[in-house]
Amino acid sequence: LIDTSQALATALGMHADIVHCHAPLPRTLLNNTELLATYQQYLSDDAQQHHKAFDDLIGRHDIAPDAAHLLEGAPENMLPRFVRKHEIDLLVMGAIARGRLDTILIGHTAERLLESVDCDLLVVKLPAEK
């Protein structure tokens, strides 16, 4: 997806920013007091794991730090704000094929974003994980 985005940006004379959103488990979903006690540690660990994985990914693709953005929050909330703030013209997203039940329960992020981003949206189907 990064390679596709970078190639597209080059071909169109654009700049490619790489954005990843991560949303930790909301505290309101926790009803176990033992889990609540460790929630702050969970948040810290989750953020650390995402930062490490994102930094590794950015490093493998030689992306400048000012073009790499790790956002905490749900993509459908964070990406429209990012698009407006940075005046993005084209948002390129990856999508995976899910089963019908997953689609009903989780939905498609791209579908939720389609009407809320102020730019064109290109969805690239990613290869199925094996």
Regions found by a protein language model. Name each.
Residues 1-40, 44, 60-63, 67, ...:
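Small/aliphatic-rich secondary-structure junction motif
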Residues 2, 44-55:
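Short, surface-exposed alpha-helical segments at coil->helix boundaries
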Residues 6, 55, 111:
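Active-site phosphate/pyrophosphate- and oxyanion-stabilizing loops and adjacent acidic/basic residues
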Residues 28-32, 80-81, 103-105:
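Short, well-ordered secondary-structure micro-motifs
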Residues 53, 75-80, 109:
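Short acidic active-site motifs
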Residues 70-73:
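Short loop/edge segments at beta-strand edges and connector loops
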Residues 86:
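Active-site charged/polar residues at nucleotide-handling catalytic sites that mediate phosphoryl
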Residues 90-116, 130:
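Glycine-rich, Arg-bearing micro-motifs that act as flexible, cationic patches
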